[in-house]
Amino acid sequence: MAYAIIETGGKQVRVEPGRFYDIELLSAEPDEKVTIESVLLVQNDGEVTIGQPLVAGATVQGTVLRHLRGRKVLVYKMKPKKKTRKKRGHRQEITRLLIDSITFNGTVLTAPTASAETADATPDTETAAE
């Protein structure tokens, strides 16, 4: 299983092709393709490449699924004995991003197809009868 560590929105996220992730708001419309070039690490078949600070020639392609808002975080400030209280809420804007592929040195790493996974999961009838 191939994966990469990218930096987006001031955070580092471990991403795999075929999965979706909630990241900081991107200025892209839903169903729009985005390319992330700030790749810090790429792992493919046990071979790990670490960038200093970025991996040269590595990009991550994804599709914006939708924009949403995160859970509400409540901030409560109070001064004792003064009857001063402030209660504020904040909801972070989030983009749900589906990772399509990871490109590294001209090699495109994508998610395994569903037909290959089901073929591996199907029990062999000859060995099951024994």
From Swiss-Prot:
Keyword terms, alphabetized: Ribonucleoprotein, Ribosomal protein, RNA-binding, rRNA-binding
MF terms (GO), sorted A to Z: rRNA binding; structural constituent of ribosome
One Gene Ontology cellular component: cytoplasm
Alphabetical GO biological process terms: translation
PANTHER family: 50S RIBOSOMAL PROTEIN L21, LARGE RIBOSOMAL SUBUNIT PROTEIN BL21M
NCBIfam families the UniProt entry points to: L21 (TIGR00061)
Family statement: Belongs to the bacterial ribosomal protein bL21 family.
Complexes and interactors: Part of the 50S ribosomal subunit. Contacts protein L20.
Protein task: This protein binds to 23S rRNA in the presence of protein L20.
Stated name of the protein: Large ribosomal subunit protein bL21
Gene source species: Trichormus variabilis (strain ATCC 29413 / PCC 7937)
Top-level taxonomy: Bacteria, Bacillati, Cyanobacteriota, Cyanophyceae, Nostocales
Name of the gene this protein is made from: rplU
